[in-house]
């Protein structure tokens, strides 16, 4: 059964904040609560806190320990696979020491014991004691891996236009119901300390691509979003979910996320490589580029062209007004052959090579039904001196050229490169 709570949901966990009103006696107020063993196993160790009054102590213990103590001196059976049941008496509950009917003593596992009395459910009892003089209003807080969220995006392209739709997928992987009067979503990089003391950095959506719950239509049309942006908190994006929410055990809830606006949408092909003297051939990669009107957290993205699925990938976190470039994979309809020709060498009077000039050519062939813009980028390492006759500086430069390849046609890109002797 769930408690009335406030929820703060992060990429890989949720913070539960349970409002409480406690009455104090002799300067102390106490709250006790029982968690099922399954729920407790998902709670981050050391995350239990109380806000609203000074904490005196927070204790937790298995609920079955007290009951086991009442069974000391009572007959039990030991059940082991492939063996006949053993009759015994429980001697000590703390380490499950039993005395066999034959007189020997044996420590056993909890799962091996059968009792004549009905045992309680496995769970953990939590006791919070705070300093207070009268009534105190506060919150019991803990973090649980049962709760998380991620944005899911769908880019629908047609002609020269594209629209980006977004859903917020909220998950409850646990067996408890959460009834939240207030719910907030946080996105961004969250650094946590594990129980072993190691730092881990989690990014919204990381490792979750493809784990989507509700299928989307060819053109994802969404109602008004209940999610409102609240700005940022120390580099984390913060959103409020209007009206709170109720999450049942195992539920995945999808609601419309922020309404994203796009400008500058374009499709193009890209060829990227590095300079060497070898001939190469291959395929260009398919790229979509656009500029979002607002910052968006990272999340899985489905791309559709006139309703047809053409790719899925993880969209990186975006910043308002900064272009986003998406690589959808190789384009079988757009291929290239790269050739390199040595044009000249410069030597000193002693015959030592000072520089060598090369011509690099990309011959592009398209079997596509429309003209396509192709961007060729080549990384040059070593001692580049000039590109197309223009002097350059640095040990690493990028030679970049663009060309339009006609439908069902060919085009070429050429540049010259002067390299100093290594």
Task: Label the model's feature ranges.
Residues 1-422:
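Long, intrinsically disordered, low-complexity accessory segments associated with secretion
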